[in-house]
Regions:
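Catalytic core of pol beta-like nucleotidyltransferases
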Residues: 1-25, 31-37, 48-100
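A short, structured beta-strand/loop element
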Residues: 37-43
Length: 100
């Protein structure tokens, strides 16, 4: 459980189901002691197979999740991450929602 931010699990699950998200995890400063009141929340998502999202829809999802969490959200998929640090982010991410 993340100590830096309170996550309404039922609302988060509803968000993920509506947007065909298979997994949602936190990464970055939200998992560390240097997380501040002004810090954004880095979120890693994976969509259901075959579900493709455009940039405008992704931006809308980012805004919606920002309202849910009460902070600016930076929403990313593994493909969005640099190959130089993708594995580290995926390995260290803290799962918040998993489909099923």
């Amino acid at each position: 459980m993340n100590k830096n931010i309170v996550v309404p699990k039922n609302i988060l699950a509803d968000f993920c189901k509506r947007h065909h998200i298979r997994t949602l995890a936190f990464f970055g400063s939200v998992l560390r002691d240097d997380f501040k009141p002004t810090s954004d929340v880095d979120v890693l998502i994976e969509f259901e197979p075959g579900h493709v999202i455009g940039l405008i829809r992704l931006a809308g999802m980012e805004l919606e999740l920002s309202k849910i969490l009460g902070r600016k959200v930076d929403l990313r998929t593994p493909a969005d991450l640099s190959r130089y640090f993708r594995e580290e982010v995926v390995r260290s991410a803290e799962l918040q929602y998993a489909q099923g």
